Regions:
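An aromatic/glycine/proline-enriched structural segment found at the starts
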Residues: 116, 122, 126-132, 147-151, ...
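Short, polar/flexible loop-turn hinges at active-site or ligand-entry regions and domain interfaces
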Residues: 5-9, 50-54, 73-82
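Structured catalytic cores of enzymes that bind and process phosphorylated ligands/cofactors
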Residues: 34-35, 117, 140-141, 174-177
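Scaffold signal of the M16-like zinc-metallopeptidase fold and its non-catalytic homologs
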Residues: 94-151
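Active/ligand-binding-proximal structured segments within catalytic/core domains
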Residues: 1-22, 214, 225-238, 248-250
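M16 family metallopeptidases and their MPP-like homologs
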Residues: 12-69, 106-128, 153-159, 214-217, ...
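Hydrophobic side chains in well-ordered alpha-helices
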Residues: 63, 144, 167-170, 246, ...
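Acidic/histidine-enriched alpha-helical segments
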Residues: 16, 73-97, 183-193, 291-317
Length: 317
């Protein structure tokens, strides 16, 4: 919504023209879910002043001013966001929600998350539902924006070379500190304990390749745990690489799936195993995956496997 326009640059064409003038700089919206929190904001990319053809231009200041204009000085009409902009964003969001099913692997993973976490925030899509989007008004969206500005923690990262004091002054002068109140980071609640029963859900679709997603709880294993690094090594051997047990055995040796990988979420103490299968191989693939997990639990891996996994993880950084 904010990318549509601000007071200084009231439409996307004006913003684009300004960015183009600033040596094709770029400002993009950031909207991601991490654990049970939403991270929203903007990122900016621009050329280092030393590489500009004309000396004396200060892109750090110019791009920062535009960024903060977009973020903190939006275009408001009658105490709400401009109706035409809201209508356009709602239409785009509804289309995005409807298009999720086109990516079957991502859709299956999201369905597993919804079923596994239920009404907890982690189980709710960051895009919301079509009904929620349609019901939202320009006024409600603006009030939610103001609440976000007033209460959400703000973190600013800069990657590159700059005058730190200059950047600090820009930030201090543009963040509306007078409107800030009751800012705090949300508490994190990991998914601990065993479920009462194993839940299995099948969504029937006319597809050639089925998607099998398994969600497991990892009680006591999370990003803050002392053995978090050890778990990452475990996952690399189990299903996190092309040399993993899932890939080499379930996919290559048994030919039970087109792909098979494990994806931990250390922020929520959860492990997801995703695979593409022939629908008739569902039970075989599931049992084979669990057999590889049992092999890991039994210590069926070598020192070479550990060394290779560590090297792979280090190279990823």
């Amino acid at each position: 919504m904010l990318s549509r326009g601000c007071k200084a640059y009231p439409d996307m064409a004006a913003i684009s023209e300004r960015l183009e003038y600033l040596y094709a700089s770029d400002i993009s919206a950031v909207y991601v879910k991490r654990a049970e929190s939403l991270i929203v904001g903007f990122s900016a990319d621009f050329v280092k002043d030393a590489f500009l053809p004309e000396k004396g231009e200060n892109l750090l200041n110019s791009v920062s001013v535009l960024l903060f204009d977009i973020l903190f000085d939006p275009l408001i009409e009658n105490g709400a966001f401009r109706e035409s902009y809201v209508a356009g964003e709602k239409a785009d969001l509804i289309n995005a929600i409807g298009a999720k099913i086109n990516n079957k692997a991502a859709y299956a993973k999201e369905r597993c998350t919804e079923i596994m976490f239920g009404a907890r925030p982690y189980g709710i899509s960051e895009l919301g539902t079509v009904e929620e989007v349609r019901a939202a008004t320009s006024k409600q969206i603006y009030e939610r924006y103001k609440q976000l500005v007033e209460t959400a923690p703000i973190e600013i990262f800069f990657n590159g070379e700059c005058n730190a004091e200059e950047l600090s002054e820009i930030v201090k002068s543009r963040i509306p500190t007078s409107a800030r109140r009751n800012t705090s980071f949300p508490t994190r609640a990991f998914l601990d304990g065993e479920p009462d029963e194993v839940t299995e859900v099948t969504d029937e679709m006319p597809v050639a390749q089925g998607k099998l997603v398994m969600g497991l709880r990892m009680s006591g294993v999370n990003v803050n745990a002392p053995d978090a690094a050890a778990f990452n090594v475990f996952n690399e051997i189990f299903g996190g690489s092309a040399n993993s047990k899932l890939f080499m055995n379930v996919r290559e040796a048994m030919s039970l799936c087109y792909y098979c990988r494990s994806m931990p979420d250390m922020f929520m103490s959860a492990l997801f195993i995703s695979s593409g299968i022939e629908p008739e191989n569902r039970e075989k693939a599931k049992n084979a995956i669990l057999e590889q997990l049992d092999a890991m639990k039994a210590g069926d891996f070598s020192d070479d496997d550990i060394a290779e996994a560590k090297l792979s993880l280090c190279n990823a950084y």
